[in-house]
Swiss-Prot record:
This is Glycerol-3-phosphate dehydrogenase [NAD(P)+]. Keywords: Cytoplasm, Lipid biosynthesis, Lipid metabolism, NAD, NADP, Nucleotide-binding, Oxidoreductase, Phospholipid biosynthesis, Phospholipid metabolism. The active site is at residue 187. It catalyses: sn-glycerol 3-phosphate + NAD(+) = dihydroxyacetone phosphate + NADH + H(+); sn-glycerol 3-phosphate + NADP(+) = dihydroxyacetone phosphate + NADPH + H(+). HAMAP family: NAD_Glyc3P_dehydrog.
Length: 329
């Protein structure tokens, strides 16, 4: 299959490397300087150092060239750049099937990635979303992982899952696009909280409690938005949440640890140097929770630290001092 990967960040590059073993892959970046580096070094030194780009991967900076032979397009750009990227694709080809590899809510609209697709395309288009517990570095190294590919089109989800599934990267199909996307978005917010907990040396018990209660509020919002409750017990729910809250490669967890150390957000983002979606997702999640009257205490704590200048210790204390309730509430 001819697959074009749009976005040469860490995850886009890792997917391109993985897929190139069985497919014809084109990797696109709009940054011509970055493209020149990739072509010269055959390594993505900016975002995925140490991982060789196979010679079979074609590199492109012109979107028309990248899409010319494509049978499937993986869109792996930050959510902030998704709409404009989709508009450029749609202007060239309205019929190419898409699989989205980005996680979050669009700022200002609070729309999920597949909802942005619906906004952009004038006609119905086949679209899926790829999500689950997957650090780019490990996928590029060929270490085992498992993902979910969700689409409203069951046949498409099963077919594409089968195309990209191997014994190293197992891919399961789903029809719950909303549930898969909500899980992928909100786990980044909970991971910031987990990083704060770890940074304050609260211990393993506290981290486990945060993950569990975090899953509860992810599920509450996800179901309210139309997701299926059982989805949140799967790879794109609890699976991705556990990895992002515990793994040392988690950028969102790193944000939390640096907040606990007293660093300010601009300094943190500059040092990490990669997009950390949880920082932006928390604003939309907080507002949706408020509008829908959904109890989201972990999200509220992270939001208050990042955007209301509440000291870390005060925000955590406010969360811990909440009145007890039934676990299933």
């Amino acid at each position: 299959m001819n697959i074009t990967v749009l976005g040469a960040g860490a995850w886009g590059t890792a997917l391109a490397i993985y897929l190139s073993a069985r497919h014809h892959v084109t990797l696109w970046t709009r940054n011509t300087g970055h493209l020149a580096e990739l072509a010269a070094l055959r390594v993505n030194q900016r975002y995925l150092p140490g991982q060789h780009l196979p010679d079979s991967i074609h590199l492109a900076s012109a979107l028309s060239d990248a899409l010319e032979q494509a049978e499937l397009v993986l869109v792996v750009v930050p959510v902030a750049g998704l709409r404009v990227t989709l508009q450029r694709i749609a202007a060239l080809n309205q019929s190419l099937p898409l699989v989205l590899g980005c996680k979050g809510f669009e700022a200002g609209t609070a729309k999920l990635p597949c909802q942005v697709v619906e906004d952009v395309y004038s006609a119905e288009i086949t679209c899926g979303v790829l999500s689950g517990p997957s650090f780019a570095q490990e996928v590029a190294m060929g270490l085992p992982a498992a993902l979910t590919l969700a689409s409203d089109d069951d046949a498409f989800a099963r077919r594409i899952a089968s195309e990209i599934h191997t014994s190293i990267l197992r891919v399961y199909s789903s029809s719950d696009v909303v549930g898969v996307e909500v899980g992928g978005a909100l786990k980044n917010v909970i991971a910031i909280a987990a990083g704060i907990s770890d940074g304050l040396a609260f211990g393993n018990n506290a981290r486990a409690a945060l993950i569990t209660r975090g899953l509860a509020e992810i599920t509450r919002l996800g179901v309210a938005l139309g997701g299926h409750r059982k989805t949140f017990t799967g790879l794109s729910g609890i699976g991705d949440l556990i990895l992002t809250c515990t793994g040392d490669l988690s950028r969102n967890r790193q944000v939390g640890m640096m907040l606990a150390a007293g660093c300010q957000l601009p300094e943190i983002l500059l040092e990490i140097g990669h997009v950390t979606e949880g920082v932006y997702t928390v604003r939309e999640a907080h507002e949706m929770g408020r509008q829908l009257q959904i109890d989201m205490p972990v999200t509220q704590a992270v939001y208050s630290i990042l955007y209301e200048q509440i000291p870390v210790e005060s925000a955590i204390r406010n969360m811990l001092d909440r009145e007890p309730g039934a676990e299933t509430d």
